């Protein structure tokens, strides 16, 4: 009897992180999906203040976070509580069974000093070549970031800026930080800043060190819930090769012109739920990736992805597949989402050496207003126009071709877009696509679809202003 009581106490000492019933999102789906498993977090609590943390906006808290995580790890895991305050920090590396919990008015601010964001190579003793995502975990189980607080990525200290994307006043503000212009004088780099050191020998090499705000790699049972992610140096959150991921009720916001300012990117993950999020991003809103070439194939597909009840304001695309998806896309449901003011709504982009095959993609009840370009677009010659990029003119080996197929859309409602449906690609790259029971109000062109692209329309109504 005593042994049974002890076992019960152990069981009850674990709490499923912010337990919430997500079963409603798995009813009446067009494909069978496994509902993600929530992380199980022990009911232990450690405050960052207990471990030397200070939310005065001046004190570096990197060691305090590390100490708190180590303390919880020795206890078998638990909740790292961050109370109201401003906590300047470098890297935060989560371990098994740990919840990083930000209370209301708690703000984690990533240090402006780039040196604070590099790990040291244990073999060479030297700084690694690329910065580590500020909040990171690798091969961990049962991890979460929850609460009502904010994580501020201080991205302007990392990102290059194109002159064409800022006002005269903004351009002067960036130059007042110091920095370096390219030869043409139309791109500003945060290199040779007035108050912070460089981490590379030149601006191009330093740009290669820029990385994401949150990245979980090969992790299982992941929850990100309630927090605000602000102004990342690159992507805001990118789970990669993870299983059982839930992203629920977060807000993601960065300047509309933030270079590579993707909000939520999912890369080669399985069993993922993305719900109730609000996004205003500088690049893609909710994006599915699957790696490029052989590496993408090895990583595997994005599989069993459920995306519902999200709102995307500015973004290059509301929901996006690509550009790299050589590992494939399989069993994806996108339902009851709103896109307002995005460049494109539903965007499928890829290119030779980046492409893969899509299977069982179902999209329905999407509501769009004020879409700048095309409401629905397929692009198979995508060029990654990152800062300093140059288009390749030499012949490219025809491998890992895009194969957008088995994509089914219905109840798509659009009030305001330049082009309704746009599709370009060689024979066999865009086929077996259906769009049904939809209304699209456009301003320039209803359809711009190559003859090689096989898209079947049924009960799709196009309207525009009277001419």
Residue spans of the language-model regions?
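Active-site-proximal loop/turn and secondary-structure-junction residues that shape catalytic pockets
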Residues: 86, 241-243, 251, 270, ...
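Conserved short loop/turn motifs at secondary-structure junctions
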Residues: 82-89, 263-265, 351-352
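Extracellular beta-rich repeat passengers
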Residues: 325, 336, 345-467
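Right-handed parallel beta-helix
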Residues: 104-105, 141-149, 220-230, 243-255, ...
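Short, small-residue-enriched loops and turns at beta-alpha junctions
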Residues: 54-56, 293-297, 327-328, 354
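Short glycine/acidic-rich loop motifs that flank beta-strands on beta-rich extracellular proteins
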Residues: 77, 91, 111-112, 154-158, ...
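Extracellular "leader-to-stem" segments immediately downstream of a signal peptide or signal-anchor
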Residues: 2-81, 86-99, 103-218, 223-225, ...
């Amino acid at each position: 009897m005593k042994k049974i009581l002890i076992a019960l106490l152990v069981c009850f000492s674990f709490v499923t992180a912010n337990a919430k019933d997500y079963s409603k999102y798995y009813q009446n789906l067009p494909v069978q999906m496994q509902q993600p498993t929530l992380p199980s977090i022990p009911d232990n609590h450690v405050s960052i203040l207990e471990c030397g943390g200070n939310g005065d906006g001046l004190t570096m808290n990197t060691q305090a976070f590390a100490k708190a995580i180590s303390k919880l790890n020795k206890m078998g895991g638990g909740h790292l509580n961050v109370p109201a305050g401003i906590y300047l920090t470098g890297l935060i590396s989560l371990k098994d069974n740990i919840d990083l919990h930000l209370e209301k008015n708690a703000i984690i601010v990533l240090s402006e000093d780039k040196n604070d964001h590099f790990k040291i190579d244990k073999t060479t003793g030297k700084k690694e070549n690329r910065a580590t995502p500020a909040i990171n975990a690798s091969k961990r189980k049962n991890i979460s970031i929850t609460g009502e607080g904010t994580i501020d990525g201080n991205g302007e200290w990392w990102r290059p800026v194109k002159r064409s994307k800022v006002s005269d006043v903004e351009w002067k503000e960036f130059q007042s930080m110091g920095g370096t212009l390219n030869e043409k004088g139309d791109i500003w780099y945060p290199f040779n800043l007035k108050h912070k050191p460089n981490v590379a020998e030149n601006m191009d090499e330093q740009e290669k060190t820029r990385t994401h705000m949150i990245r979980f790699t090969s992790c299982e049972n992941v929850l990100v819930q309630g927090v605000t992610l602000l102004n990342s140096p690159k992507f805001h959150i990118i789970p990669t090769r993870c299983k059982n991921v839930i992203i629920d009720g977060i807000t993601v916001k960065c300047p509309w012109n933030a270079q590579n300012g993707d909000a939520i990117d999912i890369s080669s993950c399985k069993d993922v739920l993305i719900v109730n999020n609000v996004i205003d991003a500088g690049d893609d809103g909710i994006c599915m990736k699957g790696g490029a070439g052989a590496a993408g194939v090895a990583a595997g597909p994005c599989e069993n992805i459920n995306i519902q009840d999200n709102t995307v304001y500015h973004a290059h695309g509301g929901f996006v597949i690509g550009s790299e998806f050589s590992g494939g896309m399989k069993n994806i449901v996108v339902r009851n989402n709103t896109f307002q003011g995005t460049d494109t709504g539903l965007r499928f982009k890829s290119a030779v050496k980046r492409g893969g095959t899509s299977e069982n993609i179902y999209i329905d009840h999407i509501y769009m207003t004020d879409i700048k370009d095309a409401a629905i677009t397929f692009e198979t010659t995508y060029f990654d126009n990152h800062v300093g990029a140059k288009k390749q003119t030499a012949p490219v080996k025809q491998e890992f071709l895009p194969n957008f197929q088995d994509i089914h859309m219905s109840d798509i409602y659009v009030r305001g877009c330049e082009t309704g449906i746009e599709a370009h690609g060689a024979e066999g790259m865009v086929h077996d696509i259906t769009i049904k029971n939809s209304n699209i109000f456009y301003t320039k062109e209803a359809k711009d679809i190559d003859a090689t692209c096989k898209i079947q329309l049924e009960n799709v109504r196009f309207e525009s202003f009277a001419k």
